[in-house]
Amino acid sequence: MEGPVTYLADPDRYSRMPYRRTGRSGLLLPAISLGLWNNFGGDRPYETSRAIVRRAFDLGITHFDLANNYGPPYGSAEETFGRLLATDLAPFRDELVVSTKAGYDMWPGPYGEWGSRKYVLASLDQSLRRLGLDYVDIFYSHRADPDTPLEETMGALDTAVRQGKALYAGISSYAPERTREAAAILDGLGTPLLIHQPSYSMFNRWIEDGLLDVLGELGVGCIGFSPLAQGLLTDRYSEGIPEGSRIARDLSLPADQLTEQTKAKVAGLREIANGRGQPLAAMALAWTLRDPRMTSTLVGASSVGQLEQNVRALDRLDFTVDELDAIDRYATESDINLWSESSDV
């Protein structure tokens, strides 16, 4: 049993965070949202996760992004957040946007991944049990399935909404034309596509080649993940590979990505950030929000201090033309789209 609720949310939490419309929908999301991918699993101290989430809400972050297999181990991030929803956040459910996803491997056998109706809807039921919720706000197809008809996967999202288990439907890492097709199918079913969640950073700009145009045309929101290129766009690797970092732990960022060319680009970007009076990470996050078609950017955090540093991006969101031109000299594709298998479908 959890102890009594002792958390008192900051009464000024909505005064510091800008909220942006999700496409043409009625839903507003904070400019910065919190992703619970690698830092909220069962391998992390619960009190650390608790402190980060509480501080996020105090800073005006109302959107918390999950997936069925976030951890490690799989499912444990949803369980951690479910504990918080049952205690500290219990009075605030209607002030929160909780999202989860299904698409990657979750359990053994042929029904434990991809985009079949059987897997997608079973996964959502499991997620709701772990979260202790009757519904999530946004339910995503986590990746494109090359072998399952798109009509089946989108039909499962529509069913989730019609059953009241999700309020909105989303997709993640879908190519531009497949996004257009998915939106058309959902429109035909009467459940509009709310949002797309692609990877997007200064070193991973694939969405600028057609996807943002499609989303703008369709009135679909966009929330970018991995905006700091798995930590490359921070000061973390300026002096080598620190213990406990993603590279050191072999988590999603291969050591061969930290090339001399990448280090030189990071150094150039850091100089521009210094000229703006911002840390590199803050500038990199602000840069992902420079396009009005971007609804929000997803940050991760392993500590309260790291979260607070990321939110400093809001101190200066504007860029001059000269700054953007200077950034473009260094912000070039760096072959770090680890999710291209889906976006190439």
Residue ranges of predicted features:
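N-terminal binding-site loop/beta-alpha segment at the start of enzyme catalytic domains
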Residues: 1-96
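Beta/alpha (TIM)-barrel catalytic core signal, keyed to glycine-rich beta->alpha loops juxtaposed to Asp/Glu
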Residues: 2-16, 144-331, 345
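N-terminal small/glycine-rich loop or linker at the start of catalytic domains
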Residues: 23-41, 99-112, 135, 140
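Short, well-ordered coil/turn segments that N-cap beta-strands
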Residues: 27-32, 60-62, 90-96, 133-137, ...
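Short, acidic/polar
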Residues: 43-57, 115-131, 179-183
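Alpha-helix N-cap and loop-to-helix initiation/capping positions
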Residues: 44-48, 76, 80, 111-122, ...
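Phosphate/pyrophosphate-binding loops at sites that engage ATP/ADP/AMP, CoA/4′-phosphopantetheine
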Residues: 89, 125-134, 277
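Active-site groove signature of glycoside hydrolases
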Residues: 128-148
